[in-house]
A protein has these predicted regions:
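Active-site beta->alpha loop and helix N-cap motifs at the rims of alpha/beta catalytic domains
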Residues: 62-150, 155-171
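Glycine-rich, positively charged N-terminal anion/phosphate-binding segment
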Residues: 2-6, 17-100
Length: 333
């Protein structure tokens, strides 16, 4: 098995989630035991306009978009673990985007499963499922011109036969693995995941298959292995479970939610994350607890420090910005 293929074999992976999978959450997942972490999907149009800046104050590499906002941030602690997911419908543009980030990530993934209107209208995401010629062009262009592994994440087609035809084409492009969400583009979380489809795909292909879509039945670490066995996949990718409690990756069991939020906030401080992203992630973790006094205070928070103060981290936040604090650099993780 080649090193590129082996990278995706027998792994537990943090699935790409919009607004969730920024650097703090990826680092938290790795700390708790995830083997690989995906970025949120970023569209190629945005990526090709980014400026790469080495942030010596934080020990990060920051990619700024045309509005001077950080579109992607990474650091040495995740260098061999982070996969950049690209939204694209054009081989040339996909390659141009991937080349800009190639030196800073462990792999490139093409989103071929997003069912949202924005992706479909742009010919991206799940729209690619019924355009196998373009799928071949995009993936072949990337595998033939990048030094890092290339993968894609798909959804099932309505019939197993059509799905197998598609993954055969995907494998022929030289990709290192394929992640399969066991639902069609028209199905949602209330629909049963097609574990039988993933199982047949796993038997059909020679490259690693990454099973996805089973988070609704994954409530503890042992459930991850149960999902892998049921699908006979090489690896498992989970989303909703770690979104609620990222310590799902711990072999030793789940941590109390408050402890997880504290750990997340510490990484957010070290990454100098913005209020909107931090608040969004904390609220997603809190779930129904947003109705509590602390939850309502989080909603009203006007700064990251305000949120930190709710978890007795105000002093930690303040000390981070002291020049004498050696722990302020992510290189010291």
């Amino acid at each position: 098995m080649s090193p590129k293929v082996n990278r995706y074999s027998e792994k537990i992976i943090l699935a790409p989630m919009v607004r969730i999978n920024t650097l703090p959450m990826r680092l938290l997942a790795l700390e708790y035991g995830a083997d690989l972490v995906y970025s949120e999907e970023i569209v190629d149009h945005k990526l090709i306009k980014c400026r790469r800046i080495i942030n010596e104050k934080l020990g990060t590499v920051d990619f700024f978009d045309t509005e001077d906002k950080v579109a992607f941030q990474t650091c040495s602690a995740e260098k061999d673990k982070v996969i950049l997911q690209i939204g694209t419908a054009d081989p040339g543009r996909a390659l141009k985007a991937a080349k800009l980030f190639e030196q800073d990530v462990s792999g490139i993934d093409v989103n071929m499963g997003c069912p949202k209107g924005f992706s479909l209208k742009g010919g991206m995401g799940a729209a690619l499922l019924t355009n196998p010629e373009l799928v071949y062009e995009i993936l072949s262009t990337l595998t033939n011109n990048l030094s890092v592994p290339v993968t894609c994440k798909i959804r099932c087609l309505p019939s197993l036969e059509k799905t197998l035809e598609l993954v055969k084409i995907i494998q022929s492009t030289g990709v290192s693995a394929v992640a399969v969400h066991g639902r069609t583009k028209d199905e949602r979380t209330q629909h049963k995941n097609r574990n039988d489809y993933i199982r047949e795909i796993s038997r059909y292909l020679t490259i690693p298959v990454i099973a996805n879509g089973g988070s609704g039945e994954i409530n503890c670490y042992e459930d991850i292995e149960k999902f892998r066995r049921e699908t006979e996949a090489s690896s498992v990718m989970i989303a909703r479970s770690p979104e609620s409690n990222c310590s799902i990756f711990r072999k030793d069991g789940l941590l109390p939610l408050e402890e997880v939020i504290v750990d997340y906030l510490k990484y957010s401080i070290k990454c100098d994350s913005g209020l909107h992203n931090v608040k969004y992630c904390v609220q997603r973790m809190m779930g129904s607890y947003q109705a509590t006094t602390r939850g309502q205070a989080c909603i009203r928070a006007n700064s990251v420090r305000d949120i930190c103060n709710l978890y007795n981290l105000a002093d930690y936040y303040d000390s981070f910005y002291e020049d004498s604090n050696p722990d302020r650099f992510l290189d010291n993780l």
